[in-house]
């Protein structure tokens, strides 16, 4: 079995969870890889999003952006969250990465990759089991 753990470099909590899961799976002799999902959209983008996220949590900007996204989704029932739409934008590269590397299971420890995986699942483009922790 080959397992992919998807995280994001937005603080270290998610990466710590990913490492704990990986360590447990390796003890079970399961092939396991951790990937920064945003790096699939580009290393530069990954760095910028990480810096913006860390800045926004310090200034409470993230809380307000999250509330705005939720309000948009609730007000316009057929419109997905802006965050979901953004995460869907790199789902093609994520799908290619999963297929090219032959992963059997995907574990997401962050909302961003979970939303990208959800977009792929909704379109029926990937069949591998996906778990969101």
What does each model-identified segment do?
Residues 12, 17, 74-133:
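Active-site and donor-binding regions of nucleotide-sugar-utilizing enzymes
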Residues 1-4:
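Extreme N-terminal starter segment of soluble prokaryotic enzymes
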Residues 20-100:
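Conserved N-terminal ligand/cofactor-binding loop architecture of enzyme catalytic domains
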Residues 8-12, 39-41, 103:
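Short histidine/acidic/glycine/proline-rich micro-motifs that form metal-
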Residues 6-8, 35, 133:
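Short hydrophobic segments within beta-strands
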């Amino acid at each position: 079995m080959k397992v992919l753990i998807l995280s994001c470099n937005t603080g270290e909590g998610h990466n710590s969870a990913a490492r704990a899961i990986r360590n447990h799976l390796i003890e079970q002799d399961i092939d396991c890889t951790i990937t920064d999902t945003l790096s699939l959209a580009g290393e530069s983008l990954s760095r910028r999003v990480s810096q913006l996220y860390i800045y926004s949590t310090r200034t409470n900007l993230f809380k307000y952006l999250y509330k705005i996204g939720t309000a948009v989704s609730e007000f316009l029932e057929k419109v997905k969250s802006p965050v979901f739409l953004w995460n869907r934008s790199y789902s093609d590269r994520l799908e290619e990465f999963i297929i090219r590397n032959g992963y059997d299971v995907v574990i997401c420890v962050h909302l961003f990759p979970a939303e990208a995986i959800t977009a792929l699942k909704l379109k029926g483009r990937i069949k591998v089991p996906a778990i969101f922790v």
